[in-house]
Amino acid sequence: MTKNAIKMWIDTARPKTLPLAVASIITGAALAAWSRQFNWIITLLCLLTTILLQILSNFANDYGDHQKGSDTVERIGPLRGIQQGMIDAKQLRKGLIIVAIASLCCGGLLIIIAYQNIADLLAFTLLGVLAVVAAITYTVGTKPYGYMGLGDLSVLLFFGILGVGGTYYLQTQQLNFSILLPAIATGLLASAVLNINNLRDIEQDRKAGKNTLAVRLGPENGRRYHCLLLIVSTLCYCIFAVIYVQTVTAFLFVLALPWLIKHGVFVSKHKEPLALRPMLAQMSLIALLINGLFSLGLLLS
């Protein structure tokens, strides 16, 4: 495999989106540590499984959009390997299958190590299979849910509630509904990353019949929705810190708020899709920074 081919596979994996996978796991692990039940092996396996699922979703996204003709050379975002002809559909499908198998194997090992009873084993096995199916069917299949505007809900669920909550539960074996606040906050920040992508590609998606939430809302309301995601996520972190942690260090995440506010103002003011191109990576890093500071604050508490 040539250096160019390797680079194309790396680009197709979209490393700039991987901080989202890391963010949900470190938050769930920090919440478990805050409850004094941290397990580094489970955390590591959760992290690896989630990263593989993110890569699987990215591969499936490119494959599905290519098959449906949604991604063309006119797209504003970076051109993927399949668009440039460096990777053909057959190769990408093979890569997709390999990553799907790796995700299932890693997730299976995680469940075997972490489960305490048959109910947990069955529940997390089902959730693992659903996660793989959801990653693939976002754009692949006869009725991909990404084309129906349901991508944001899926991201909130898998990169927020299940990502954070699952990591927490597998270590503590406890259902603690208070952690829904940081879990939802993490998911909303991840949804903001997807929304930037969809705002940027809104015209191309509309032409291709890809009715993302941004397409349904339109450019103006899509930007209002983006700001709402940022505001509500911040409120969720604040409410959790005030009610459940009650220490100054729990508010470490506010150190990242100036960057978050600057990002929101930029997205609101700049209407040109091309201007949003660097915002996806920026939002992804902001999400990681906020979750990292929130997690550090929990550990110091």
Residue ranges and their predicted role:
Residues 2, 78-174:
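Intramembrane alpha-helical segments
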Residues 155-202, 220-224:
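Functional transmembrane core segments of multi-pass inner-membrane proteins
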Residues 1-41, 45, 143, 155:
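Topogenic membrane-insertion module of multi-pass membrane proteins
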Residues 75-114, 213-245, 285, 290:
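Multi-pass membrane catalytic core of lipid/isoprenoid biosynthesis enzymes
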Residues 27, 36-60, 123-136, 177-196:
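Membrane-embedded alpha-helical segments that form the functional core of polytopic membrane enzymes
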Residues 52-76, 192-214:
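Acidic (Asp/Glu-rich) catalytic motifs at the cytosolic membrane interface
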Residues 242-301:
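Extended hydrophobic alpha-helices typical of membrane-associated regions
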